[in-house]
């Protein structure tokens, strides 16, 4: 997906109000799966290894692992929700 397509999809989601609904749904699913707790523990562990904690370096270390920790069913469900929205928007 190109940056322009991604930007266009996001704009349509925001304009329709679906972005907020999707965001809330994802947050709830992540919370229920324990993802926030896992990422928090990961960030704390990484921060304890650094003499001076800088957000940019912490994000650089934790973000790829945090993305990997998202359950596959949440990823699939999210993509299906976006695809469903796009099908309706393109009709």
From Swiss-Prot:
Highest taxon, organism lineage: Eukaryota
GO BP terms, alphabetized: chromatin organization; poly(A)+ mRNA export from nucleus; protein transport; regulation of transcription by RNA polymerase II; transcription elongation by RNA polymerase II
Gene Ontology CC: DUBm complex; nuclear pore; nucleoplasm; P-body; SAGA complex; transcription export complex 2
Location(s), subcellular: Nucleus, Nucleoplasm; Cytoplasm, P-body
UniProt xrefs under InterPro entries: TF_ENY2, TF_EnY2_sf
Quaternary state and interactors: Component of the nuclear pore complex (NPC)-associated TREX-2 complex (transcription and export complex 2), composed of at least SUS1, SAC3, THP1, SEM1, and CDC31. TREX-2 contains 2 SUS1 chains. The TREX-2 complex interacts with the nucleoporin NUP1. Component of the 1.8 MDa SAGA transcription coactivator-HAT complex. SAGA is built of 5 distinct domains with specialized functions. Within the SAGA complex, SUS1, SGF11, SGF73 and UBP8 form an additional subcomplex of SAGA called the DUB module (deubiquitination module). Interacts directly with THP1, SAC3, SGF11, and with the RNA polymerase II.
Protein task: Involved in mRNA export coupled transcription activation by association with both the TREX-2 and the SAGA complexes. At the promoters, SAGA is required for recruitment of the basal transcription machinery. It influences RNA polymerase II transcriptional activity through different activities such as TBP interaction and promoter selectivity, interaction with transcription activators, and chromatin modification through histone acetylation and deubiquitination.
Name of this protein: Transcription and mRNA export factor SUS1
Source organism of the structure: Yarrowia lipolytica (strain CLIB 122 / E 150)
Classification lineage: Eukaryota, Fungi, Dikarya, Ascomycota, Saccharomycotina
Gene: SUS1
């Amino acid at each position: 997906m190109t940056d322009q397509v991604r930007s266009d999809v996001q704009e349509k989601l925001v304009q329709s109000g679906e972005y907020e609904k999707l965001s809330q749904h994802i947050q709830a699913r992540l919370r229920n799966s324990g993802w926030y707790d896992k990422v928090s523990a990961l960030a704390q562990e990484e921060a304890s290894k650094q003499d001076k904690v800088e957000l940019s370096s912490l994000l650089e270390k934790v973000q790829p692992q945090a993305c990997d920790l998202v359950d596959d069913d949440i990823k699939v469900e999210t993509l299906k929700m976006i695809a469903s929205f796009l099908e309706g928007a393109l009709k």
